[in-house]
Amino acid sequence: HFYNFSGGFKYKGFEVNFLFQGTGKFSRCISGVGAYESEYQGVFTDLHLQAWTPERWNNGEEIKYPALSLRKSTNHQPNSFFIMDASYLRLKNAEIAYTLPVNICRKVFTERIRFSLSGQNLFTIDNMRSKFIDPEVGNMGTFQPYRVYNIGVSLTF
């Protein structure tokens, strides 16, 4: 289930616009650099910090990853452990803007002056087991969506 919703409002020269997007009831099998500890020259991520060890098991610590290994084993085959809930809600775009009153604009020989601050991928709420896995991408070896900020000035003469 994919969804998005957008909206905005204007009030006395101020303007706010936003776009949320996400998925619901969606699972993804993670892969790539960092998913398996012995692949790709041994790249480790936060997934591996809570791997099974006899000591951790005996101490009653929370186990979130199978035992680490330097050789391929059943841990490195596709299995249900690597299937994650990829449902998410992301603030994909947001913009805050202010348009100066006409009487001020005319003093500087313009019809309209608008200042804006916008951003993309500002925050995401998800259930992924690692901060290095984006639910939209699903592959640890791929660049995650960048958080981008823009400042703008629009002049109309």
What residue ranges belong to the model's regions?
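Long hydrophobic segments that form regular secondary structure
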Residues: 5-14
